[in-house]
A protein has these predicted regions:
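Short loop/turn motifs at secondary-structure junctions and domain boundaries
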Residues: 269, 563-565
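Transmembrane helical cores of multi-pass secondary ion antiporters/exchangers
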Residues: 1-415, 419-422, 489, 493-496, ...
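Cytosolic C-terminal regulatory domains/tails of membrane transporters and channels
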Residues: 401-535
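Canonical RING-type zinc finger of E3 ubiquitin-protein ligases
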Residues: 566-575
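In a subset of proteins, long, contiguous C-terminal domains/tails are tracked
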Residues: 2-6, 500-533, 576, 594-622
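Short, positively charged
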Residues: 42-43, 257-258, 469-470, 547-554
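Cys/His-rich, Zn2+-coordinating zinc-finger modules
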Residues: 534-557, 564, 579-622
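Short cysteine-rich clusters marking metal-coordination/redox-active sites
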Residues: 558-561, 574
Length: 622
C-alpha cells in the first residue's frame, strides 16, 4: 500500500472513532486502543512498529509542549510538593517494587532487566491522565496535580531506565552515587536548557507580529528545548515542560491577541491528531509483541500470569505510595493535606501510555526476555487504560467529588470582568483629551461595561424565563450577520468585487460571529449546570430551595457601608433579592441586618473563589 494511503487511513480511522466515541460518551483513548488491537489482527494490514526515535523525538516533545502551554504555572507552583512526591518519589518506588515482582514472575528476566521493566511502566502518561481527568470532571486541584505529575515523571523514569540499561550492558552493579549524579545532571540540565530556550524564544516572539510566523515559531519550540538538552545528557522532557510552562505563562504579554488565538487553534488540532495517533498505535502493537513471545517459545501458561501480576503490582504500588504519603502528610498536619476521597482518586488515576511502550525498545536487542518485557509493558498500558480509565468516573461519583462548578466559575468571571472594566474605564479617564469626541467616549464607556453586565446577566438566566439583554443581542445580531454574509456572497457571484476585498469582509463577519458563539456557549454551559440538582445530605430546607446565584443589586460593595461612610471586611449576597451587604466581621453587619429586616434566610459569599452559603434561620452552612 502507498504510504499516502496509510496516512489517509490512519487519519480516517482517528476521525471516525473519535467522533463516534464523543457521540456515545466513551473515552477516546480507550476506544482507539481497542480499535487498534482489532485492526492489528486483520490480515494484510500494515504493521507499524513503534521505535524510540518515533515516540521520544517525534511524538513526545510536541505532546508535552501542547500540555505544558495550557498548564497554569501558578497552579504548578502551588502544587509543587505533591507533584514532586508523585513524579520523583512514586516513580522511584514503583521502579523498585515492580522490578522485584517482575524479577520473580517474568520468565528469563535478569534483575537489571526487571528493574528496566519497572522504570518503563512506572510513569503515568501525560496524555492519558489529562484526557481522562478532564472528561471525568474531577476537581481542578486533582487535575492540576495529575497534569503536573505526568509532565515531569518521564524524566525520572528515563533516568532509572538508563541506569538499568547501563547495568545490563556492563553486567555489573551501578553505584547509588552514579544514579544520583545521573538524576541531578538530567534534572538540572533539563531545567537550565528549558529556561534558556524559553527566554531565547520569548526574545524572538516579542519582535513577531504576524500570527503565521508566531505559530511557526511555536511549532519549533519543543525541539529548540528538547534537542540541546539531550545533547548535554540533560532531560529533554524537563526542558520541553519548562519551556512550555514559561511561554504559556508569558503568552498574554509576548503575543498579540491574533497570535494567541491562532496558536491555540493550531496546537489543538496538532494535539488532537498526535494524541489519537498515539493511542491507535498502542493498540496496533499487540500482534508483533505476541509474535515475538511466540518466537521465544515461552509457554503462555507462564507469560499470561506474569503479565497479569506485573499489571497488579503497578496498580498496587501506586495505591500503597499515595495512601502512605497522604497518611504522613495528615500526621504532620501539612497544609493542604488531601482528604481520603481525593487520595483514593489520585491513587487510582495511574493510566499509562505510549512512552511506556516506546521505552521498551530502548533495551538492547540481546536483552534476555525482551519480548516478554514488551508484552508485560503492553499489558500494563492496556490494562490501566481500560480498568482504571473505565472505573475512574464511577469512583469520582461514588466518592461525591464535585468537579468545576459552572455557576461558581461564572460568579468569579463576573467579578473579574467587572474589575477589569473598571480598570479600563479608569485608564480612559486618564488618557482622554478635550479634543476627543464625546460620542466616542460614551461609546467606549458603554462597551467597557457591556461585558460586565453580560457576565452578571448569565448568572440570573436560570432563575427567570425572561430573555436577558445579552441573549437578545446575540439572537438578533446573529440573524443580522447571516443576512450580511448572504449579501456579500451574492455580490461575490456578480464578479463586481475583487476577491481580496470579499475575503476581508467575510473574515470580519466570521470573527464577530465566532466571538458571539464563544460567549453564548459559555452561557449555555452555565444554564445546564444551574438546572442540575446539587442537594446534599445535611442541607436545611431553606438551603435546598434557595437559588445558587442571584443578580446583585450593586457592583460597588455594601450600599449601607457606602452610605454610612464605613468599611466592609467581606461581602455577602442575598440569594432572594440580590442585596449586597457586609459580613458579621464588619462594623455594620448589614447582611445580618438585611435578614432581620426582610426575613430572607439564605446568603452566599460574594468574594471571588468562595461558593459557600449560609442559612440565617437555621444557623447552617451549606
Amino acid at each position: 500500500m502507498h504510504p499516502a494511503l496509510d496516512i489517509l487511513g490512519l487519519v480516517a480511522v482517528i476521525g471516525f472513532v473519535a467522533a463516534g466515541a464523543r457521540r456515545v460518551g466513551y473515552s477516546e483513548p480507550l476506544v482507539l486502543v481497542a480499535v487498534g488491537v482489532v485492526i492489528s489482527f486483520i490480515p494484510h494490514v500494515l504493521e507499524i512498529v513503534l521505535t524510540p526515535d518515533l515516540v521520544l523525538i517525534g511524538f513526545l516533545p510536541p505532546l508535552l509542549y501542547a500540555a505544558a502551554i495550557r498548564t497554569s504555572l501558578v497552579d504548578f507552583r502551588a502544587n509543587r510538593t505533591p507533584i514532586l512526591v508523585l513524579s520523583v518519589g512514586l516513580v522511584a518506588f514503583s521502579t523498585l517494587a515492580i522490578g522485584l515482582v517482575a524479577w520473580w514472575v517474568v520468565p528469563g528476566v535478569s534483575l537489571a532487566a526487571a528493574f528496566a521493566l519497572g522504570a518503563v511502566v512506572a510513569p503515568p502518561d501525560a496524555v492519558a491522565a489529562t484526557t481522562v481527568a478532564r472528561r471525568v470532571g474531577m476537581p481542578r486541584r486533582i487535575v492540576s496535580v495529575l497534569e503536573g505529575e505526568s509532565l515531569v515523571n518521564d524524566a525520572t523514569a528515563l533516568v532509572a531506565l538508563n541506569t538499568a540499561i547501563a547495568a545490563l550492558m556492563q553486567h555489573s552493579s551501578v553505584s547509588p552515587a552514579h544514579i544520583a549524579w545521573d538524576f541531578v545532571r538530567a534534572a538540572g540540565g533539563g531545567v537550565l536548557v528549558g529556561l534558556v530556550a524559553a527566554f531565547f524564544l520569548a526574545a524572538i516572539r516579542k519582535r513577531i507580529e504576524d500570527p503565521v510566523l508566531d505559530t511557526t515559531l511555536s511549532f519549533a519550540a519543543p525541539y529548540v528545548a528538547f534537542l540541546p538538552a539531550q545533547q548535554i545528557h540533560g532531560s529533554g522532557v524537563l526542558a520541553v515542560v519548562v519551556t512550555g510552562l514559561v511561554l504559556g505563562h508569558k503568552a498574554p504579554v509576548l503575543q498579540s491577541a491574533g497570535s494567541r488565538i491562532a496558536e491555540n487553534i493550531n496546537w489543538r488540532t496538532v494535539q488532537f491528531l498526535l494524541e489519537n495517533v498515539v493511542f491507535l498505535l498502542i493498540g496496533l502493537q499487540i500482534r508483533p509483541l505476541i509474535n515475538g513471545v511466540r518466537d521465544d517459545h515461552v509457554p503462555w501458561s507462564e507469560v499470561i500470569p506474569a503479565c497479569a501480576i506485573v499489571l497488579a503490582a503497578t496498580i498496587v504500588a501506586r495505591i500503597v505510595w499515595v495512601f502512605g504519603v497522604a497518611a504522613v502528610f495528615r500526621l504532620l498536619r501539612t497544609q493542604g493535606a488531601w482528604s481520603w476521597a481525593v487520595t483514593a482518586v489520585v491513587a487510582w488515576a495511574g493510566m499509562r501510555g505510549v512512552v511506556t511502550l516506546a521505552a521498551v525498545f530502548l533495551l538492547p536487542p540481546d536483552t534476555p526476555g525482551r519480548n516478554e518485557i514488551g508484552l508485560a509493558a503492553f499489558t500494563v498500558v492496556a490494562g490501566t487504560l481500560l480498568l482504571q480509565g473505565l472505573t475512574l468516573p464511577w469512583l469520582v461519583r461514588r466518592l461525591k467529588l464535585r468537579g468545576p462548578d459552572a455557576a461558581e466559575d461564572a460568579l468569579q468571571a463576573a467579578s473579574l470582568v467587572t474589575d477589569a472594566a473598571r480598570a479600563g474605564l479608569a485608564v480612559l479617564d486618564e488618557v482622554r483629551s478635550e479634543n476627543d469626541p464625546a460620542e466616542v467616549l460614551d461609546q467606549l464607556r458603554e462597551r467597557g461595561m457591556r461585558r460586565s453586565n453580560q457576565s452578571w446577566e448569565h448568572l440570573g438566566r436560570a432563575q427567570t424565563e425572561l430573555e436577558p439583554p445579552a441573549a437578545t443581542y446575540y439572537r438578533l445580531r446573529m440573524q443580522m450577520l447571516s443576512a450580511e454574509r448572504g449579501s456579500i456572497l451574492a455580490a461575490r457571484d456578480t464578479g463586481r468585487y475583487d476577491d481580496e476585498v470579499l475575503r476581508a469582509a467575510l473574515t470580519n463577519i466570521d470573527m464577530e460571529e465566532a466571538m458571539l458563539d464563544r460567549i453564548e456557549d459559555a452561557a449555555a454551559r452555565l444554564d445546564d449546570e444551574l438546572v442540575t440538582s446539587h442537594h446534599r445530605a445535611g442541607d436545611c430546607e431553606h438551603l435546598r430551595e434557595a437559588p445558587r446565584v442571584a443578580e446583585p443589586s450593586t457592583l460597588n460593595g455594601c450600599e449601607e457601608c457606602v452610605r454610612d461612610g464605613t468599611r466592609w471586611v467581606h461581602l455577602r449576597l442575598c440569594l432572594a433579592c440580590g442585596h449586597v451587604g457586609c459580613c458579621d466581621s464588619s462594623v455594620g453587619k448589614h447582611a445580618a441586618g438585611h435578614f432581620a429586616e426582610t426575613g430572607h434566610p439564605v446568603m452566599r459569599s460574594f468574594e471571588p473563589g468562595e461558593a459557600w452559603r449560609w442559612c440565617f434561620a437555621d444557623d447552617l452552612l451549606g
